[in-house]
Amino acid sequence: MTRIGSVQKAILIGCMCCALAACSRDSTRTTGGIFNQQEVPLEAYQPEQIYERGEFELNRNRPDDAAFYFAEIERLYPYSDWARRALIMQAFSYHQDQDYPNSRSAAQRFIDFYPDDDDAAYAQYLLALSYYDQIDEVGRDQGLTFQALQALRETIERYPDSEYARSAILKFDLAFDHLAGKEMEIGRYYLRREHYTAAINRFRVVVEDFQTTSHTPEALHRLVEAYLSLGLTDQAQTAGAILGFNYQSTTWYQDSFVLLTGQGLRPEPTGDGWLGQIYRQTIKGEWI
């Protein structure tokens, strides 16, 4: 392209952005200048013009307006290549606006309509993020966390070679850790109120189902506390033995060691039960 051609293209794009700048949410705009003022419907524009307007709104940090224009392309030019491109941008724009239900809906439509497209992996990743980005604190309802885990797992399994797989794996681990944190929070609540059996049930879930998370050492220590409080020394010693075998350098093991030795006990496997089974798995390298 010649220099004159490049300038002409730049002028044309600038004019299109200015022309669309006055577009309102009722799909019309007002023109002025040497012409009489008139309303021009959005339908009068080509899809690439509307698409550029959407990009313009994104650059202005107005994702809600951007999503509107991208959605209009899907409405006005369905089944076109511009509709395909606009749909993934619509999902992205809604996500930027923290409109997670609409982002998820747009991403799911993209996956349904274009399952083999290069952007399908990104659509699935956006769908997962629509759940994941709402996980903000341990005390929140865990339904979103389960949905995030499911969507992230699908991203990893369906698109293992995509550029989003690694990020999905990291977020999956964090969401998994979040669920374990919820169990720990409830377990501590019961432990403080001396509801030892209820507390043990929560800590057991962490040890059995979330053993790869960062909460496992504390869960084992809390089991030592709870079992000692109930006078169940065999289980307390076995929990301490598992803790010492896997996390000997942690303060949780040091605290458990002090508790056990303070009662003349040692952190060693004693008896059978569920902790005894885990200890045997630990020795064989089958646990954690």
Name each region found by the language model.
Residues 15-16, 91:
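Enrichment for repetitive, rod-forming helical segments
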Residues 18-22:
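C-terminal motif of bacterial Sec signal peptides marking the signal peptidase cleavage site
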Residues 14-15, 128:
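A periodicity- and composition-biased signal for non-globular, repetitive helical segments
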Residues 6-13:
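Sec-dependent signal peptide recognition
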Residues 2-5, 23-288:
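Acidic, polar-rich low-complexity tracts and alpha-helical solenoid repeat scaffolds
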